[in-house]
Amino acid sequence: MTRPAPPAVSAPPPLLEVESAWLEDPPRSKARFEKARTESSSFDPSAKPRLVEWLDPGGAAPAAVAGWDEAIEAGAPFRASGPLRIEYTLDEALTEKVWRIMRKGRVDRGQVIVIDPRTGRLLAYVSADEEGLPANRAYPSASIVKVLTAAAMLEVDPDQSDSTCVYRGNKYRVNRRRLDRPSSGRESDLEAALATSNNQCFSQWAVHVLGEEKLRSTLRRFGWLNPPAPGHEAGRAEAVETRLDLGRLGSGLDGVRVTPLHVAALTSVLTGGRWIEPWWVDRVVDSHGRSLALPERADSREVISSEIADRLRTMLVSTTKRGTAKSAFRTRRGRPLVPGIEIAGKTGNLSGRDPSGRYEWFMGVAPAKNPTIGVVVLQLQGHLWWAKSSELAANVFKATFCEGKRCDAELASRFTGDLPGFEGPMLISDLDALDALESEPPPAAPAP
């Protein structure tokens, strides 16, 4: 009597799928950070440097899918067994350093993001007041928008961007009369205008060189009119009705609102010319150790050429060397705060509403020639404040690139994991890839 053939089994079951809503709220608050770091050290020593949270999906468990197990017949359905373990890309040690910097700066309402701009992977995502200043909401972008205006200038007419702007009086004040180039006054080129955040120059360029269509298309290409990642608001740009509206839009005086995560994605564009969706979840595992498939991230896309990205970073170094952030990146004795590391950055500040206060930004990447770290800081300041956003960012860069009195670009690998042979934090997905690589048979020896 012939025995029936066993069910064909050639591969493990497909990964269960995670609902994106479960992953839209990383542990940004101090309370959730402390809980996540405790849980990260309780289950897997190899993942200790990364933050971990547990999720009980309850009735919202992933849909059943067809799978197999030796204990059940092939094709029988199974479900993810909760609670689920969410393993973040957020680095415990770096996040603790960021919290210390914010505490020393007495930050009441503010956010800090540290990102690997080459991949979009978040290394720290901190929010001092999730109720008063939610990290997923859009706020006035202030002069950060000048980076996009400068990119548009370099695209439209590289020679024009090398020419000078002429302005009179206070470079930060713009009115209808100051939208046109005066017959005489002080001069500034694009690099100097970026470094000093010259509103008159950027307003003139917006009106006479770029126009509304080019500015709005640039905002759209940079991803500023869409959500930067799941769970975050889309950016928005107000309608332009007058020349003054256009000038204020291009200089950042009004009209554009974005989340800090939009600005974090900008660091990726500055690094390689490509928009990359920021992400903060490495993997999700059920109670049986089965990985769940994560929602697919948006495809990266080219926004500007790598040549323009390189040129922008070179210009933005002037901000930290002799521009609006010069004092933040120097010690009281005038020495570089992060010696040997050039930092490209941009400041921004603007009074706004909803909520009311002074919005102060800093965005930067380092090392400027080959960025591995991006930092974004946003504060909402009241009548009293203790530290500028550029000062907070400078200390975050110092914590990333310095150890004791030694500062070196390679020290960032403590958090990004780039340094060969470095036995530090690795993502579980990195370990899986390493296991797969080590399991491959060695190549055959060449024939004599």
Q: How would you name each of these model-derived features?
A:
Residues 98-102, 120, 138-163, 193, ...:
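Active-site SXXK
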